[in-house]
Amino acid sequence: MSVANPEFDPVFKPLMKLIREFHEDQKPVLGVCLGSQLLARSFDAEVYPLNDLEVGYTPLYITESGVTDSLLTGLSRRQTIFEWHEDTFDLPNGAELLMSGDSCYHQAFRIGSTSYGFQCHFEVDARHIDVWIKEGREDLVHYHGTGADEVERDIRRQMTRHVGLSSRFAYHVGDRWIDLVSERC
């Protein structure tokens, strides 16, 4: 499923309308991966294929704007977070870039004070990743061919090293997200 694919517009257009309504009412919005792409497109930004599968634990960098953002403040500038996506997006007009990456630059952004998009999958744990590896085998083979087994092994090695730190990031952002929702709702 891709926000860049017009075939899914009958599903996505009502969601994007709801996202805009929430934003206009200052109700917090948090989009992760597909959700970040929907948020970007809701504000007329382009969503398009990355021409690669960004998969595995990836170094991401909190920007100057991110350092002072209420969800990210207090975190180390460099984070290693799980990724599994093949699309990316331009930033909507007026959005603040909060996190960036090397192969997919736009990793997290905020529009206004309550609408957030995260391209990375900070919400997943080892259990989720195991399922995604099994169910996403076709993607791994499509993008990596005979190297798919090595990519899978790399992901599993990375998991043992990074899943704990990634979980801390998730709890940090999640706690602050709950605070934001409590303030606004």
Could you describe each region identified by the protein language model?
Residues 22-46:
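Catalytic nucleophile loop
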Residues 1-30:
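Flexible gly/pro-rich beta->alpha loop and the following alpha-helix that scaffold active-site loops
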Residues 4-7, 52, 162:
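Pocket-edge positions in alpha/beta enzyme catalytic cores
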Residues 7-13, 34, 42, 93-94, ...:
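Generic recognition of short, well-ordered alpha-helical segments
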Residues 11-15, 47-48, 99-100, 134-136:
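Glycine-rich, phosphate-binding/catalytic loops in enzymes
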Residues 43-128:
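Pocket-forming structural segment of enzyme catalytic cores
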Residues 12, 16-20, 72, 174, ...:
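Short amphipathic alpha-helical segments and helix-helix/interface helices
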Residues 126-185:
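Acyltransferase
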